[in-house]
Amino acid sequence: MSKEYTNKQIDQCVPAAYRWTLVSSEIEKLLLKKNNYFIQEKYEITLTKKVSAYFLFVCILSFFSIFYLYLKQFFIIVNRRIKIESVILDTGRGYDCNNVYKLFKIKNDKTYLINAFSIDSYMQYERVGIFNLTKNLINSIYDYKVVLKMGFSSDIVDILVKNGLTNLSTYTYLKTFFEEIRNKNPNSIIYTSTALIQSHAAILSNLKTVNIYHGLIGKVCLNIYPEYYSIYVYSFDEKRYFENIGVTSKVYVYPAIKNKLHNKNVILF
């Protein structure tokens, strides 16, 4: 990949503050299939009446959705801790958490271990205020509208609108949650294994966020990928791949014992 192409790719990529809106396996497949890493240069296209009307409906429902989440948290027992240094977002694989404990000095009494994809799991540790929820929802709606008008193809716009209610309410709640963590300790570190919308919420709350890969990586779509503080991978080829496509995160290779006796080892796949 040429340096010139890489620079063009980065320059025309969706700004990091808006990428959370595009988190969707369907959108990612479309972007990668079309090799559409970058957006049209002209912003502020006019939305069709159908898209505008449906998006307005989604926005209205989003206010009811976050109010429901606000009330729901009071029916869940909170195990709040005075000081938090780490939050591990468990993606359900098991070995992703093991990687975190192996690499970093984690203190269990100052750590939240959260099921990354369950809002109820976040509610077990912190409660969020309705004012902050509402403020973040309004900001999220603005972000969503900006992306809708960026000039993506109609199939991507349709998916954006279809996923709007889920993405708006989920991201809004997560961002408000991570702001609570930041207020407790701005030096808290978030560890995750590619939980994308959760990562965006943490990063945009100004928290250091580390992505721990548990296996070989696939192709990365820069329009969706979060700007992690650091990334851990298994091979130098993966490290070079991230560096070549213009990812600005610090990329590290997992430490390993060098194999010098090639004729006395068995590798199991």
Language model regions located:
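Active-site and donor-binding regions of nucleotide-sugar-utilizing enzymes
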Residues: S2-P255
